[in-house]
Amino acid sequence: RLKEEVDANLVSLLKFPALEATNLVKHAFSTRMGGVSTGYLSSMNLSFTKENSYDNVLENYKRVSKALGVDVEDMVLSYQTHTTNVLKVESKHRGSGILRKREYGDVDALITNEKGVCLVTFFADCVPIYLLDTKNKAIGLAHSGWRGTVERISEKTFAAMQSNYGSRAEDMIACVGPSICADWYEGAVEVADKFR
């Protein structure tokens, strides 16, 4: 189960007790609460590609970073296109997607073992996958839509952690974040057939 924390600005963050108990990683799943965006994007819009001002979105990131206890400068945003591409994030990527242009594209999963780097991915109805290697102190975060799920993005993210950091299954904690449920998901038969 997820635990909700709400700060003084009413920023609502959902956290996994299993990850918190390790004291190895700061993590969260943001909600739509506590931001400054207006209209149909209110209030915690974190997408620079939607119809909202850059200043509002940047302020939302500042609020999330404060509530989480990280710096905006340390955040690295994915560039999601429903692929299974995994980016090994290094210090040189800090601020990418927020404070400066990303030098990468088509990335739906991020991994790192660099302390202080904050991985950021985006979700609406897709599935967030959080990975923590408790021995090698590496993390992964994957955006798993139906295509990524069929094409095994979680497995590919773990494989990237294995090859880059020596991660082993017995040292991993994996958490599945909030996503759409079967009651609300509408999909075509040809999509459902891909899961068989």
Label each residue range with its predicted role:
Residues 1-196:
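Active-site microenvironment for binding and transforming phosphate-containing groups
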